[in-house]
Amino acid sequence: MLREVHLAGTPYAMGREHGRQLEDQVHHLALERYELARAFAEAHGVPLTRQQCEEMARQHLQLHSPDVIEEWQGIADGAELPIEDVFFANALTDFQDVLWQSASAEVHGCTSFLVAPDTSQDWHPLIGQTWDMHASAEPVIAIFHRTPDNGPRSLVLSTAGCLTLIGVNEAGLCVGNNNLRPTDAEPGIIYLALLHKALAQDNWDDACDALTADGRASGHNYLVGEAGGRLADIETTAGEHEIFPVDSGTYIHTNHYLSDRLQAFEDPHQDQSSTRHRLERARQRLAAEEQPVTPDGLRQALA
């Protein structure tokens, strides 16, 4: 059973309560993320120390909005950790996207889906994904019930010490994601902060704008849904993006670009065997499921 954490108030107050309730888990994840970064760098021929990670965190932290920094500071204070440790735990995926360009790396990760109302059993939109996370992260996963002083309430799945990963808010907006690795990755706003900002919005346009804001660190694929039935898949690089409205049927995405224009940002030497196989397999399995599509059918298709 996942732990549920209730947060309310200002960004700092919510962060501090987050850190206080999950202090041990935040410490565990922060230490683990440093070790994962070191091991990833070593595997790709790049020497890396914890001190270097901390210095990168200090440099890049200030690129984020004040409310996000305040929440990270609250988490750090609540868990009695330096804010650099909290930030680096949040930033590992984007850090790896910048680092991977120094050497070849297999493209693996999550598989996501969008199902339009005309294809779902109850005529409601469906949105979801797998989560290709290290098994060691399971003890630090939590559900966060967020009631901010300003903005809609939200229900979020994430890891201890981190911002939004997957979630839905009371305005009927929901977000998900899977990773992409463009060649223009650079220090900038990390994807968890973008998702966090998107779920703080109360309308479709502002949520999409939050995900495509200037200054992104790397590329990600974002899923956006609205209770009224509107769905879109947003592919991004650090500096470019493309939006694919999903008005009918189903849409599957893995970890390579489907946009012809954005494929120019992929390294032609990267190993895409996993992501391309998963895309075709998910499409085949979903096509084989009984219609209309149900949540149970989606779980079976992705199992």
Label each PLM-derived region with a short phrase:
Residues M1-A79, P117-L126, T130-A303:
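C-terminal, well-structured catalytic/ligand-binding subdomain of enzymes
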Residues D77, E84-P125:
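Gly/Pro-rich turn-and-neighbor structural signature
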